[in-house]
Amino acid sequence: CWELYWLEHGIQPDGMMPSDTTVGVGDDAFNTFFSETGAGKHVPRAVFVDLEPTVIDEVRTGAYRQLFHPEQLISGKEDAANNFARGHYTVGEEIVDLCLDRVRKLADNCTGL
């Protein structure tokens, strides 16, 4: 999904936009999904969370891995095996505070939430 967003907005895998690209400039929808770093990279406004680590590891090793800050990629050590109680009370409970903290940090950086 994110790869499609980058392609639609002309963002390269290193997060940079070619200088001749005007897609997204001044566009509120564009700024909803991406923020620009001090170095000019366009990075997603997202936190990825999964109790099962292999899914998040695909993002960590994928073509666009440079665009995700490691703090935005949160994974557990094991999945909940499709068991709500296990995900809510045991395995998931271990990372819920970390997830809430990361989402709070992203929300703090928003100008109009």
Swiss-Prot record:
<protein>
    <recommendedName>
        <fullName>Tubulin alpha chain</fullName>
        <ecNumber>3.6.5.-</ecNumber>
    </recommendedName>
</protein>
<dbReference type="Pfam" id="PF00091">
    <property type="entry name" value="Tubulin"/>
</dbReference>
<keyword id="KW-0206">Cytoskeleton</keyword>
<keyword id="KW-0547">Nucleotide-binding</keyword>
<comment type="similarity">
    <text>Belongs to the tubulin family.</text>
</comment>
<dbReference type="InterPro" id="IPR002452">
    <property type="entry name" value="Alpha_tubulin"/>
</dbReference>
<dbReference type="GO" id="GO:0007017">
    <property type="term" value="P:microtubule-based process"/>
</dbReference>
<dbReference type="GO" id="GO:0005525">
    <property type="term" value="F:GTP binding"/>
</dbReference>
<dbReference type="InterPro" id="IPR003008">
    <property type="entry name" value="Tubulin_FtsZ_GTPase"/>
</dbReference>
<keyword id="KW-0493">Microtubule</keyword>
<comment type="function">
    <text>Tubulin is the major constituent of microtubules, a cylinder consisting of laterally associated linear protofilaments composed of alpha- and beta-tubulin heterodimers. Microtubules grow by the addition of GTP-tubulin dimers to the microtubule end, where a stabilizing cap forms. Below the cap, tubulin dimers are in GDP-bound state, owing to GTPase activity of alpha-tubulin.</text>
</comment>
<feature type="binding site">
    <location>
        <position position="52"/>
    </location>
    <ligand>
        <name>Mg(2+)</name>
    </ligand>
</feature>
<dbReference type="InterPro" id="IPR000217">
    <property type="entry name" value="Tubulin"/>
</dbReference>
<dbReference type="GO" id="GO:0016787">
    <property type="term" value="F:hydrolase activity"/>
</dbReference>
<keyword id="KW-0963">Cytoplasm</keyword>
<comment type="subunit">
    <text>Dimer of alpha and beta chains. A typical microtubule is a hollow water-filled tube with an outer diameter of 25 nm and an inner diameter of 15 nM. Alpha-beta heterodimers associate head-to-tail to form protofilaments running lengthwise along the microtubule wall with the beta-tubulin subunit facing the microtubule plus end conferring a structural polarity. Microtubules usually have 13 protofilaments but different protofilament numbers can be found in some organisms and specialized cells.</text>
</comment>
<keyword id="KW-0342">GTP-binding</keyword>
<keyword id="KW-0378">Hydrolase</keyword>
<dbReference type="GO" id="GO:0005874">
    <property type="term" value="C:microtubule"/>
</dbReference>
<keyword id="KW-0479">Metal-binding</keyword>
<feature type="binding site">
    <location>
        <position position="52"/>
    </location>
    <ligand>
        <name>GTP</name>
    </ligand>
</feature>
<dbReference type="GO" id="GO:0005200">
    <property type="term" value="F:structural constituent of cytoskeleton"/>
</dbReference>
<dbReference type="GO" id="GO:0005737">
    <property type="term" value="C:cytoplasm"/>
</dbReference>
<keyword id="KW-0460">Magnesium</keyword>
<dbReference type="GO" id="GO:0046872">
    <property type="term" value="F:metal ion binding"/>
</dbReference>
<dbReference type="InterPro" id="IPR036525">
    <property type="entry name" value="Tubulin/FtsZ_GTPase_sf"/>
</dbReference>
